[in-house]
Amino acid sequence: MGPPGNDSDFLLTPNGSHTPDHDITQERDEAWVVGMAILMSVIVLAIVFGNVLVITAIAKFERLQTVTNYFITSLACADLVMGLAVVPFGASHILMKMWNFGNFWCEFWTSIDVLCVTASIETLCVIAVDRYIAITSPFKYQSLLTKNKARMVILMVWIVSGLTSFLPIQMHWYRATHEKAITCYRNETCCDFFTNQAYAIASSIVSFYVPLVVMVFVYSRVFQVAKRQLQKIDKSEGRFHSQNLSQVEQDGRSGHGLRRSSKFCLKEHKALKTLGIIMGTFTLCWLPFFIVNIVHVIQENLIPKEVYILLNWLGYVNSAFNPLIYCRSPDFRIAFQELLCLRRSSAKAYGNGYSSNSNGKSDYMGEASECQLRQEKESELLCEDPPGMESFANCQGTVPSLSLDSQGRNCSTNDSPL
């Protein structure tokens, strides 16, 4: 990146006037800058708006305040910081073709960039472990991962991410020793991230590849267990249905005691698919950059600078995708509609299970409080085999009963907010 005003940047006629070719080139450059500025502004707005919406929804609606969604909040915070403190300065760097914020902010900005990516991948890794425990050890899950423990885990994720991002950069452990890099470090208008080979490889492994391998391994195990559960549900659904019909005849009350284990299981597996899409999207967006990041320090001239920047921005765009993916969840869709005032009436909002409480928060009410109380009273664990068999492969979690209140309304609720 040459300094502005270099004579090679334009053509002059003998009398000092611009040639038509130069005018055309200048117009194209201006159009490119305007187009890129609009595109980058849209990306920043999408990242900030979407993740503020996610954080607000989880904070306001008690129905969404689950342990898993605490981790989702951490992920949204990382994306929000990316949209506020990283992407705008990266856009300025590209559009202005120089760095205008000094050496200190250059290194600090780079540290925040690494922090957000590291915190995101480590949070996704924690979510994978969270789902693995939930689906393989449902009896122990609530004691192993309480909300307070989830907060501690999130704090540890950010501390570790901060140490692995800020410490090497602020201590200048990352710096290369060749002449081009040293010139850039001394130039306040240059913020190209020249790194030595050891730092590039070590930081990529610690901040990305190790958490990625753990995440993929754990989540593949989660889907294997989930697949076995679906197969067992398919085989046993008829037995559950016939047992519950007999109970209805004995009780003499239509609909009371009818269990919907398959419905619950499908909701749980849809939640797993949503989380899988989030992890897959993150991997697809960031993996190419981290591959190029290592190749670049081994063979600098092999990867064009434009490709490096493009793949870096592909990673940035990932921060705008997650709020769109969350819309797969009915609970998040309802919460977003409530926050954006897109619901036609308050009656419809109540019918979908959200209302405001005395503290100004909103919670999921089901059809009415009577339904909620009845559901809490009648929910239980349904086991396919006698106790002592393998954990959740035999028991289908806490399955709400499909019961009716005094007015004949359905009292079932969705136990999978995501």
From Swiss-Prot:
Residues 59-71, 130-150, 221-274, 330-418 are cytoplasmic. A motif (PDZ-binding) lies at residues 415-418. Residues 1-34, 96-106, 175-196, 299-305 are extracellular. Residues 1-23 are annotated as: Disordered. GO terms for cellular component: early endosome; Golgi apparatus; plasma membrane. Keywords: Cell membrane, Disulfide bond, Endosome, G-protein coupled receptor, Glycoprotein, Golgi apparatus, Hydroxylation, Lipoprotein, Membrane, Palmitate, Phosphoprotein, Receptor, Transducer, Transmembrane, Transmembrane helix, Ubl conjugation. It is found in: Cell membrane; Early endosome; Golgi apparatus. Disulfide bonds join 106-191, 184-190. Glycans are attached at residues 6, 15. Belongs to the G-protein coupled receptor 1 family. Adrenergic receptor subfamily. ADRB2 sub-subfamily. This is Beta-2 adrenergic receptor.
